[in-house]
């Protein structure tokens, strides 16, 4: 009735008071002929289709991002798509949603060519890792048709059983080209190669279930300006830590972080750590924080004018450290604690997902980004 009133109100304003009775008769005729009933049925049924489309799109978006994140972490889990599609369904379909296809890079299987339709995903991105998640209508009873609320009751429309709604979302994952590092330190590519067997051996990433820490044998010692046990990585005189284990970078934020957006970044000479870095080291070590740090292939120049050449970003968990004026015992393998005149970072390399969006296209050293792309 509210719909009828809204439709009739503009007409009533255009006519005189004496003619409004005639309009009432006209409305009654329209109701009797099913015209306004048909309009109401159209509004309600189309509204349901739009609602189902929104739910399916939300489910596809969430599912594609979840699958991309699992792939970035090292193990693609396409079954996540169905979980998120169902989680975004409402009582309109009895809490059910269908996943017609999950496809993409690697083990996900190749996707068919895009149809260009609004309900389809865009063409596969060239040279990128991606996943497409296609969702479609499914009711709790297993039907692929969204049943009409009123449309089937209209004259001549008794055979209408409903419609199938579709949606698609695409997500990508890959290594970043720019990043604000979790700690203003850097390590050499030589050390990363040796400690990860050239990117083939990683410890599991935090958080960990009780009694499920990584093996102590995966704990590494990154010496500052020294070879340590990593005899294949040489070192240069103090103040130029290439290509030996780790060194400090220029703090871009005042919180012991370095913003890197390009192929080079600044060197901070010397072994001493700022108070901000001592605070950050203590928090990261105590909380088993996954930090993302740049990996360099060379150092150019000398002293404060020197700069590192970026290879990529690694994911690292600090288990202990010893720097001038601050230290913490290695919680994974205390036998690796530094002593005497040595300064070091202890920890292990893993694979991890950088929170938030970013620019992909870098060399994958364990740190990845996952984000929606279409």
Predicted regions and their residues:
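Conserved, well-folded catalytic cores of nucleic-acid-processing
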Residues: 70, 87-92, 136, 172
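Enrichment for repetitive, rod-forming helical segments
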Residues: 60, 93-95
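N-linked glycosylation sequons
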Residues: 75-82, 95-374
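Coil-to-alpha-helix initiation sites in intrinsically disordered, low-complexity, charged segments
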Residues: 1-2, 144
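Alpha-helical assembly-interface signal, strongest on the long, hydrophobic N-terminal helix that forms
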Residues: 2-87
């Amino acid at each position: 009735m509210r719909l009828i009133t809204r439709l009739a109100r503009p007409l009533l304003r255009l006519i005189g008071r004496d003619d409004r009775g005639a309009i009432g008769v006209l409305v009654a005729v329209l109701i009797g002929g099913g015209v306004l009933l048909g309009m109401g049925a159209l509004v309600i049924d189309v509204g349901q289709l739009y609602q189902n489309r929104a739910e399916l799109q939300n489910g596809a978006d969430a599912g594609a991002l979840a699958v991309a994140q699992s792939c970035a972490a090292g193990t693609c889990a396409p079954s996540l798509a169905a979980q998120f599609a169902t989680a975004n369904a409402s009582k309109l379909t009895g809490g059910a949603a269908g996943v017609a296809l999950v496809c993409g890079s690697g083990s996900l299987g190749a996707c068919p060519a895009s149809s260009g339709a609004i309900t389809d995903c865009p063409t596969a991105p060239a040279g990128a890792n991606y996943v497409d998640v296609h969702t479609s209508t499914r009711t709790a009873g297993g039907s692929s048709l969204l049943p009409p609320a009123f449309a089937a009751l209209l004259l001549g429309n008794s055979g209408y059983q409903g419609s199938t709604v579709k949606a698609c979302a695409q997500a990508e994952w890959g290594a970043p080209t720019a990043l604000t590092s979790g700690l203003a330190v850097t390590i050499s590519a030589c050390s990363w190669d040796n400690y990860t067997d050239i990117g083939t051996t990683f410890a599991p990433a935090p958080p960990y279930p009780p009694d499920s820490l990584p093996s102590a044998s995966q704990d590494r010692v990154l010496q500052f300006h020294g070879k340590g046990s990593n005899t294949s990585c040489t070192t240069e005189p103090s103040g130029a830590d290439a290509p030996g284990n780790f060194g400090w970078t220029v703090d871009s934020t005042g919180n012991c972080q370095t913003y890197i957006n390009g192929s080079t970044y600044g060197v901070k000479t010397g072994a001493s750590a700022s108070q901000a870095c001592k605070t950050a080291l203590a928090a990261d070590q105590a909380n088993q924080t996954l930090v993302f740090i740049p990996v360099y292939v060379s150092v150019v120049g000398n002293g404060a004018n020197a700069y590192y050449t970026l290879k990529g970003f690694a994911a690292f968990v600090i288990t202990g450290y010893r720097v001038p004026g601050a230290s913490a015992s290695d919680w994974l393998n205390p036998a690796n604690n530094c002593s005497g005149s040595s300064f070091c970072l202890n920890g292990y390399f893993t694979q991890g997902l950088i929170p938030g969006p970013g620019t992909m296209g870098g060399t994958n050293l364990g740190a990845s980004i996952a984000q929606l792309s279409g």
